[in-house]
Amino acid sequence: MSPKKAKKRLEGGSSNVFSMFEQTQIQEFKEAFTIMDQNRDGFIDKNDLRDTFAALGRVNVKNEEIDEMIKEAPGPINFTVFLTMFGEKLKGADPEETILNAFKVFDPEGKGSLKADYVREMLTTQAERFSKEEIDQMFAAFPPDVTGNLDYKNLVHIITHGEEKD
């Protein structure tokens, strides 16, 4: 497919992406896009991603990892493409339920909390491993209680809603 056709197809096929989200969600995506678009040119490129990772404390991101992220897009990543990519990833998924289910695998008794040391071990040794800095940031933002437990239900609520449960 020629670049012109691909661009036309992308523009035509993505116009309904705005109907997939509520206005508040679109605004949140726009804020995220603006934060990631470090050079303010209206597109997210490799340098923007590297700068975003650095701002989040991940300074040793491999070029291959960034290349893979860029390759997920059908072309230059403007806001519409960014929104379309998230729409495809989130289609049909309730983020709160998805994250809760991931934690529930480690909580067969359904208590709603896990030992912080166990969470630390799992996040640094399994699948998409967190760095020590990422773990430290998480526990700084969501400290365990006095008995060393992490209230993952509240953590998930804050991640997905941006505020604590009443």
From Swiss-Prot:
In-chain residues carrying the UniProt-annotated modification N,N,N-trimethylserine: 2
Protein's organism: Rattus norvegicus
Miscellaneous comment in the UniProt entry for this protein: This chain binds calcium.
Modification sites for Phosphoserine: 14-15, 19
Assembly mode: Myosin is a hexamer of 2 heavy chains and 4 light chains. Interacts with MYOC.
Known function: Contractile protein that plays a role in heart development and function. Following phosphorylation, plays a role in cross-bridge cycling kinetics and cardiac muscle contraction by increasing myosin lever arm stiffness and promoting myosin head diffusion; as a consequence of the increase in maximum contraction force and calcium sensitivity of contraction force.
Tissue expression notes: Abundantly expressed in both cardiac and slow skeletal muscle (soleus), with no detectable expression in fast skeletal muscle (vastus lateralis) or non-muscle tissue.
Record protein name field: Myosin regulatory light chain 2, ventricular/cardiac muscle isoform
PTM annotation, UniProt: N-terminus is methylated by METTL11A/NTM1. Phosphorylated by MYLK3 and MYLK2; promotes cardiac muscle contraction and function. Dephosphorylated by PPP1CB complexed to PPP1R12B. The phosphorylated form in adult is expressed as gradients across the heart from endocardium (low phosphorylation) to epicardium (high phosphorylation); regulates cardiac torsion and workload distribution.
One Pfam assignment: EF-hand_7
